[in-house]
């Protein structure tokens, strides 16, 4: 044990000596010891203390060993002992002793010491304490004889206590840079020894010339005067507290200095630039490309020369024009704004003058390309004008196109069935025609192309379209009913198109048939019949018996000869769309009527909004055709979309040209739509109007047109109708989702709901209405519009009672004793209180009793007790009126 202990003490002694030498405390201790020995040898107090201590040594009383003896010389025997010390142990004290006789430093010796030297010693001891753990290692000096300080001398002795708190051991984690190498590899490369040595040497020289003062020392020098180092014995306790606080402050200041120095050293060795790269480490930069620091780019003016000549097509947006001129859109907008024209980037320029002026301002000649406009205007010339401009030698006689028009249920379709020897009327929903039928029938007088138009008021557009495309109009009038509204409308369409009119007075087999009434009505409409000396041919017919049908055919053939109907079969085909629909297997199909030229299988067609290539072509008997001559209606497939009923078509060179034409047309439509944005109806908002939103799906395009026309003609000052979408086909899932999002109603006409969309209707709670007859759909929409209106409330008086007395109840409140003066007071009806002809309150009855029994009603002349619901301010003499609220639906 002794060997182990000696070895341990020896190691600690060697370590402590090395640390002391490294900190430079040995020289300072020698200076302090020499200064102290010269003063204490001449003082008589030190000799007296030596005698007292020698006497106490003989007495054998042990003296407490000081923790740190800063005044001992190198010759004094030292013993370094390591021990564990808890936080509850006594605070270590620093006692300054003289080297000669090992006595304590008294107050008389304090003036002999210089303040800067004490400050430097304190700093050096604190620096030494920072290097070594004072909580685990304690230095002690064991003298040859034990010493004990008397109580009287303790008061005169200067004891400087320094509390050293245990320091937490800082564990330095290994630092790895972005290269994956340890920081020690970088220290060897970035550390410059000569620069550090020079700095250290200059620091030592400065320390030798003038001791360094820390933050605590400088603070003490500022706060304390120069002569406060020597104080009387009575102020010793306060001096101890101040010295302890100053030492703590000095310790904190030294810790901050040390942390700053350590941070600076770390930055010097592991300095990184703003992108995380090591500064000065060229080896690691070989594989990493150092990012160049981005500086603020100076505004460079790019001088772009505008082209001298460009060619554009109108209309064009400001953005597109700027791109063609190699300029910014803001430059064009600025130039236009200077001259009083306000435009934005997406505005459309359709004026040739404005476009040419812009080019003149920027030194550019702008030429308007008219080739695109010529493509868009392919269908502007009428078919009749084209036929008139054709060489007469190429023209041949074509079949007449006859349209049967008239009021609903007057027998138009029945006459056509009799001519064709078919039965189409029986298969139609509601026994009315709701589609435009086009077919060719062979008669004894030749072939006739027949158009069967609907007679219902909703199909006004179909009748107008039939009048435009046909050559002769057969006006069917029922002899027992006379001319009706739709008959008059058909006459107006025929007059507007300047078409020959032939009147067929139908139902001549009925007993109430009156032809004179029909003649008179025709004369009133400026259609004077031949029987009355006019030019309008009239024929009495009966679709059931067949009477007069042969005469009708002969009259049609005669009118066709008079008109001299001709066409050019060698020209490219032109015509009109009679009807269109979406077929489940064939896609978009259309019934077209060829007016001029010959339509062949495989040719490319252009409509208003779509194009196509004729893949198949069938007649009314579903027979495949290779070509269609003038006045022939055919059903074609292979279209890109569903064309609208009434749209003209023309044959073009190939499908590529057709695509280019449609693309140009769609672009123009989008620009026009951008110019004519739908503005909100502020009048409807101010008038608090209701709006019914509809989504229409139908089997054919003509049905959509007719249904939409009928719905929009429903006039109402309280409800507006808005059609969000109108398409051909079955009701799909997207339609249901659109209706749910916009809170709209889906109207299906001659169509059905797709299978995968049916469960979505229940989940999203969307209202879907399916119809086969158009007037049923119109009536249902009117009911829906009426349901949107709030009902009108009407108050009907049932009776009245006068309050005769009031009774207070702690549980129920105020009970009113009343006498019924008029009618009947009913318990479940409303009550109003009237005082001086003014209504004070409206509410309901909480209880109605007569002779302590609950009753439902009390009649005139009887007394009752009434308890009102949450009202107790009625007075004697007030009138209680009982009334009933009746709600009446509003009218459109």
From Swiss-Prot:
Residues 431-435 are annotated as: G2. Residues 506-509 are annotated as: G4. Residues 139-166, 252-276 have a biased composition (Basic and acidic residues). Residues 406-413 are annotated as: G1. Keywords: Cytoplasm, GTP-binding, Initiation factor, Nucleotide-binding, Protein biosynthesis. SUPFAM superfamilies: Initiation factor IF2/eIF5b, domain 3, P-loop containing nucleoside triphosphate hydrolases, Translation proteins. Pfam families: EF-G_D2, GTP_EFTU, GTP_EFTU_D2, IF-2, IF2_N. Residues 200-211, 225-238 have a biased composition (Low complexity). The keyword Endoplasmic reticulum does not apply. One of the essential components for the initiation of protein synthesis. Protects formylmethionyl-tRNA from spontaneous hydrolysis and promotes its binding to the 30S ribosomal subunits. Also involved in the hydrolysis of GTP during the formation of the 70S ribosomal complex. Belongs to the TRAFAC class translation factor GTPase superfamily. Classic translation factor GTPase family. IF-2 subfamily. This is Translation initiation factor IF-2. It comes from Chlamydia trachomatis serovar D (strain ATCC VR-885 / DSM 19411 / UW-3/Cx).
């Amino acid at each position: 044990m002794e060997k182990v202990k000696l070895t341990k003490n020896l190691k600690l002694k060697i370590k402590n000596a090395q640390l002391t030498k490294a900190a430079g405390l040995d020289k300072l201790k020698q200076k302090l010891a020499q200064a102290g020995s010269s003063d204490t040898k001449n003082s008589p107090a030190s000799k007296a203390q030596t005698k007292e201590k020698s006497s106490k040594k003989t007495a054998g009383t042990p003296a407490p060993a000081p923790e740190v003896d800063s005044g001992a010389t190198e010759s004094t025997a030292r013993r370094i002992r390591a021990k564990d010390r808890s936080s509850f142990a006594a605070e270590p004290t620093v006692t300054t002793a003289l080297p000669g006789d090992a006595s304590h430093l008294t107050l008389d010796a304090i003036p002999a010491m210089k303040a800067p030297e004490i400050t430097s010693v304190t700093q050096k001891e604190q620096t030494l304490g920072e290097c070594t753990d004072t909580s685990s290692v304690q230095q002690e000096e064991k003298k040859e004889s034990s010493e004990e300080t008397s109580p009287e001398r303790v008061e005169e002795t200067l004891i400087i206590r320094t509390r050293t708190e245990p320091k937490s051991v800082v564990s330095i984690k290994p630092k790895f840079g972005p290269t994956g190498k340890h920081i020690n590899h970088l220290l060897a490369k970035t550390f410059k020894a000569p620069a550090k040595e020079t700095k250290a040497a200059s620091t030592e020289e400065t320390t030798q010339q003038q001791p360094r003062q820390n933050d605590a020392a400088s603070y003490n020098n500022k706060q304390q005067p120069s002569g406060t180092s020597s104080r009387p014995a009575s102020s010793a306790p306060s001096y101890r507290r101040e010295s302890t606080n100053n030492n703590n402050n000095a310790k904190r200041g030294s810790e901050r200095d040390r942390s700053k120095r350590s941070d600076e050293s770390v930055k010097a060795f592991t300095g990184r630039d703003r992108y995380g790269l090591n500064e000065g480490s060229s080896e690691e930069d070989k594989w990493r490309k150092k990012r160049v620091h981005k500086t603020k780019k100076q505004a460079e003016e790019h001088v772009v020369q505008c082209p001298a000549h460009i060619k554009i097509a109108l209309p064009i947006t400001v953005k597109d024009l700027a791109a063609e001129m190699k300029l910014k859109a803001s430059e064009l907008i600025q130039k236009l704004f200077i001259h009083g024209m306000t435009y934005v980037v997406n505005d459309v320029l359709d004026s040739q003058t404005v476009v040419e002026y812009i080019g003149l301002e920027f030194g550019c000649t702008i030429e308007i390309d008219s080739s695109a406009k010529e493509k868009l205007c392919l269908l502007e010339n009428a078919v009749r004008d084209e036929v008139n401009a054709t060489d007469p030698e190429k023209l041949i006689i074509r079949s007449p196109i006859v349209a049967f028009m008239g009021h609903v249920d007057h027998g138009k379709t029945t006459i056509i069935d009799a001519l064709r020897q078919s039965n189409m009327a029986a298969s139609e929903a509601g026994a009315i025609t709701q589609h435009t039928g086009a077919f060719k029938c062979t008669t004894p007088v030749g072939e006739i192309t027949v158009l069967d138009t609907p007679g219902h008021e909703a199909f006004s557009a179909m009748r107008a379209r039939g009048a435009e495309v046909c050559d002769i109009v057969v006006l069917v009038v029922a002899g027992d009913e006379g001319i009706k509204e739709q008959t008059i409308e058909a006459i107006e369409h025929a007059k507007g198109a300047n078409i020959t009119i032939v009147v067929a007075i139908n139902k001549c087999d009925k007993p109430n048939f009156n032809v004179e009434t029909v003649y008179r009505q025709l004369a009133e409409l400026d259609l004077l019949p031949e029987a009355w000396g006019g030019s309008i041919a009239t024929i009495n017919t009966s679709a059931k018996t067949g009477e007069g049908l042969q005469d009708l055919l002969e009259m049609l053939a005669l009118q066709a000869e008079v008109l001299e109907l001709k066409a050019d079969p060698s020209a490219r085909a032109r015509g009109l769309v009679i009807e269109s629909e979406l077929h489940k297997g064939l896609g978009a199909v259309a019934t077209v009527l060829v007016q001029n030229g010959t339509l062949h299988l495989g040719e490319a067609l252009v409509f208003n909004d779509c194009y196509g290539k004729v893949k198949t072509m069938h007649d009314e008997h579903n027979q495949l055709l290779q070509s269609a001559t003038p006045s022939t209606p055919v059903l074609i497939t292979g279209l890109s979309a569903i064309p609208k009923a009434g749209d003209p078509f023309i044959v073009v060179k190939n499908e590529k040209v057709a695509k280019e034409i449609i693309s140009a047309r769609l672009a123009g439509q989008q620009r026009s739509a951008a110019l004519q944005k739908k503005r909100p109806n502020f009048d409807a908002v101010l008038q608090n109007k209701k709006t019914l939103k509809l989504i229409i799906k139908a089997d054919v395009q003509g049905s959509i047109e007719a249904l939409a026309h009928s719905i929009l003609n429903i006039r109402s000052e309280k409800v507006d109708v808005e059609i969000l979408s109108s398409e051909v086909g079955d009701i799909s899932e997207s339609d249901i989702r659109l209706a749910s999002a916009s809170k709209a109603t889906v109207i299906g006409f001659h169509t059905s709901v797709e299978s995968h969309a049916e469960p979505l209707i229940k989940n999203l709670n969307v209202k879907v209405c399916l119809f086969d007859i158009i007037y049923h759909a119109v009536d249902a929409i009117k009911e829906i519009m009426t349901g949107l209106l709030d009902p009108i409330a009407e108050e009907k008086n049932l009776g009245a009672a006068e309050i005769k007395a009031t009774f207070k109840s702690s549980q129920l409140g105020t009970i009113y004793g009343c006498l019924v003066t008029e009618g009947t007071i009913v318990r479940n009806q409303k009550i109003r209180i009237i005082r001086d002809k003014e209504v004070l309150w409206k509410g309901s009855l909480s209880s109605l009793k007569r002779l302590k029994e609950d009753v439902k009603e009390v009649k005139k002349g009887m007394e009752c007790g009434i308890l009102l619901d949450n009202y107790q301010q009625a007075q004697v003499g007030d009138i209680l009126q009982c009334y009933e609220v009746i709600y009446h639906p509003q009218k459109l």
